[in-house]
Amino acid sequence: LENREKAYHLAVSKKDKLLEQAKTLHISTGNSKSADIDWGVAPFIREKGIFYIYVSELGGHVRSILCKNPILYSVVEDEVFSQNIWARIRLKFTAETMEIHRDEREFEIICKKIAERHGNVMNVIREFSDFHLFAIKPLVGVIVTGFGSAYDVSGVDLKLSEKPLSNE
């Protein structure tokens, strides 16, 4: 039991570090008109457990979000920080995704925070009409924290299940 608790606390620590260091959210989705898979990457900020991305509808994955197709989001440990390239920490989850429109008060606040974290390019693309701001509220998923170490996660805090996943 003590080893399981240590492993759990280590996994929580790895999740927290991943979310602190990561700068991009991976987005994958099926295309409702074909068997194609659309995939993209977007810089994100995270506020109170909600991820925010500002992305162009020129990307197929963004059009899929707009069409309400099922989306799988993931955050992957940067290779630079990984102790073992074969065991990079990775988190994948489903989410409730909502667009924040330009006329909403929250739009300006979030765009400013994205610019603070990711640079002044945001101040340029903020005016581009093909870009959309999305709030992504995690529902359920899985985090892999190393070889043989994976946990279910749930909710905006991405709370780990008490027991690790197993092959049994």
Q: What is each of the regions a protein language model found here?
A:
Residues 21-22, 68, 117, 128:
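Structured helix-beta-strand junction loops
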Residues 28, 45, 54, 74-76, ...:
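Residues in well-ordered beta-strands of folded domains
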Residues 24, 39-43, 92-94, 131-135, ...:
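Conserved hydrophobic/aromatic beta-strand scaffold that supports enzyme active sites
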Residues 58-117, 140:
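Short, structured beta-strand-loop surface elements
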Residues 2-10, 113, 121-168:
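C-terminal edge-of-domain segments
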Residues 29-33, 77, 145:
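Short acidic, glycine-rich loop/turn motifs
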Residues 1-66:
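An N-terminal domain-cap segment
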Residues 30-31, 40-41, 61-62, 80-84, ...:
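Catalytic micro-motifs at enzyme active sites that drive phosphoryl/nucleotidyl and oxygen chemistry
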